[in-house]
Every structure is written in structure tokens, then in C-alpha cells.
Amino acid sequence: KVTQQGVDDRLQAILRAHEQQMGDFTLHLDGQASDFLPDSGRWQWRYWGEGHFTPMQARWDVKGSGEWRDNAITLSSLSTGFDKLEYGTMRVSTPRLTLEQPIRWLRDAEHPRLTGALSLDAAKTTFSGGSYLPASTLKFALDGRDPTWFQFTGALHAEAIGPVRLSGRWDGERLRGQAWWPKQSLTVFQPLVPPDWKMNLREGSLYAQVAFSAAAGQGFEAGGHGVLKGGSAWMPDNQINGVDFVLPFRFSDGHWQLGIRRPVSLRIGEIVNQVTARNLTADLQGTWPWSEANPLQLSDVSVDLLGGKLTLLQLRMPQRDPALIRLQHISSSELTSAVKVKQFAMSGAVSGALPLWLENNQWIIHDGWLRNDGPMTLRLDKDTADALVADNVSAGAAINWLRYMEISRSWTQINLDNLGVLTLKASINGTSRVEGKNSTVHLNYAHEENIFDLWRSLRFGDNLQAWLEQNATLPVRRCTDGKTCKEPK
């Protein structure tokens, strides 16, 4: 009943809403009123509801109890959540928000106050590839003027991950906040590594700090930095040790600005693989996704490998010019050992340049080259040479001249198209020294193979053997037995 003092007896309310993109919900309130008017009297109620949250393909429900007594509204119990949240390849299982302390809103004209504490709990969060975030809990407290202006503080835990400390404020239009991730061991993030990677995180520490804001017209924006120190990860076929990674970033309007005052920095002490690489450095700065107006630039790439060094001064995306990879003093003996070639052995160093294209209709590498830095040697494996001579009598004499050769000059042209077809054209000049006999050798070698198949099979030595068998010709003999060979004038 309704009197001059307000509503007495049972009081109910039902709220329904629907929005095309966000979804729909229905909320019921049912309780007992006693001389109730807004900010006067008392209305005790329980509430419940349900709905759908379309952007994340989720069903929503809520229930709880509370009261409105004079100018104070109190939520004494609350349980609300989703059956799941799905966004892209991420799936959060059964997230639920409950009260740690009652939420109390004092609607006083001179001294309004909003207080309370909540806990957001979720079961496992899964990602593509089988990686996951363990069951997590975010506990936070509210303190402010009213639901349109309050501050919050809290912390996020996910088993050994965290705590990530949070603080911020809501002013009715914009949510602003900060998150601090204190330094902790890299090993606690093992669940986030997909099992198919077979990667074991062993050492290192990680810490981060992020500031963020969100508003209806602005969307979500964030900026901050993350730091990885002394990281180490082992896999069945390789080890990565001594990783230092610094990531300053901003995110706005769907774009990442990587590197603000300083570029993103990657330093790796050692990569142990079929080829061991050491002292890798690389810097990255720019926008992702990139555009002509806002490019992304990789710079100052350097790594020590195969007794020499590989460098790349700059790679700009979108790409206007090829990025020049320089090879300096690469050991041919270390290279042939790394790819496990048994048919021949080489010694000596080579240098070269590989113009790299990532945005080209035809080429990945075009007009690359290699040359010898000084004297080199080529020695055919005895069993390989003997087998070639036995199987091909006409080529046998030529093969014998190539059993051991000192190379004075070599030049190799390298092309790799975007279908993976690698083309090598080599010109080699040198002296054959076999059984005390010296002869000048001019060898032209051409080879073509899909490099993806080559990486899988590592059959380079077998292919060279087949080419020698089919193309070897007898070198011109320039001297008599036992005498030093000389070029004719």
C-alpha cells in the first residue's frame, strides 16, 4: 500500500534491457518496504537476474540481497558471473564476482561515500596451443563518492603468478589505472607456454608496469614497459640462454607503438642449436600494424656464429629497399660440420652479402653473393671419391683431381625466390694437389633446390656428390709429374 509516508508492504521491480551488439538482461527486485520513499524509510530486497553478453558469447546471471534504508543503499550479498568468456582464442572459465565486504553507498548531500570490497574469481583461462593461465583471483576494494566517482585498489593472483598490484579510479566517463608486476621468476609462467613448443623455462626474472585508461569514445589505451632479465629456455633441439628483453610500448586505437623514448631491446647470450650463435642483439621501434606513415624498423642486428659474424643494419616495414644481411669471415669448416656433410670437408673463411626482401612479388634474396676471404681448401672424402670413380669411369679421372684442392678464388651468386627455390652459381679457381701432381682447376658449379626441403633433409652433400658424378670433367694438366704447375702465359 502507498501512504503519505511512502510504500508499505511488498515492493517489486523488474528491469529489462536489450542492445543489438551487447546482448540483453532481465533483473528482478523483490522485498519488503516500510514507509519507503527514495532516501527515506526502508526497503529490504533480494535480487536476481540473467542475460546474454554477445561480444564474448556468454550467459550472465546475478543474485544477492540488500536494502535501501533512508539515504544509504547496502548490498549485503552478491554473486554474479558468466558461464564462460570467449574472445578470439582465449576462453575464461566460470568467472564470478562476489563480495568480500558489503558495498555501502551513503547518499548524503554534503558527505557522500561509497565503500566495499569484491573478489573476481575465475577457473582456468585457456589459449590456443594448449597454454593456460591457472585459476585466478582478483581482490579489490572501492572507496569514493558514489558509483560515478570512486577509486579502487587490488591485487591479482594466479597460483604462483603474481601478485599484480592494481589501482585506479572511475569518474563516470573514463576508467584510469595502473598495474605493477613485481619481479618474479620466469619459471612461474611455464603454464603459459604451449605444450607443443616443448619449451622448458629454466631461469630469469620478469617485471612490468602498465598505465591504462578506457572510455566509451576512446576505447582502451595503455602504455608501459616490461623487462626480462637473464632468461633461459631449453627445448629438445636447442637451448636459449642469457636473454635480456626490454619492451616499452603504447597501445591505442588497435595499434601498438613499440619503443617510445628507447627502442625495444633484445639481447641473447647464447643459442645452442645445430649452429651455436652467441651475442645476439636486435632493436625494434615503430608501429604495429605498420603503414607508410607509421613504419616499423628493425635495426642493429648482430650475431656471432660459425666463427664469424652476421649483421643487419636496418629492415624497414613497409619495405622500400632490400635489407642487407652481411656475412663476415664465416668459417666454411664450421658450416660443413654444422650441416653434417660427410662427402667433403672445407677450410677457410667466406664473406658476403644477402639482400633480403620480405615484401616482394618474386624474391626473398636477390643477387646475393659469397667470396673467399683468403686461401681455402676442399677435400673429398676418400670413400666418396672412390665410389664415384668406381661408378663412373669417364668421370673418374676428373674426380681424382678434386680429391684435394687449394682454392685461390671463389665467387658464388645466390638467389632465393618466394617459393623457396634456392639457386647457387659458383665459380671456383684453384690448384689440385694429388699424389704429388699439381694442376690448375677451374670449376663452375650450379645448384638449384627448394630450401624448405633442403632444411628438412640436410642432403646438401648428397646433392653435390650427384652433381659431381654427372658434371665432372678432367682438368687441364699444366705440368709434368713431380714439378710445380704454372699457368701458361
Question: How would you label these PLM feature ranges?
Answer:
Residues L247, Q314, D367-N372, L416-N418, ...:
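Active-site proximal loops enriched in glycine and acidic residues that flank catalytic Cys/His/Asp
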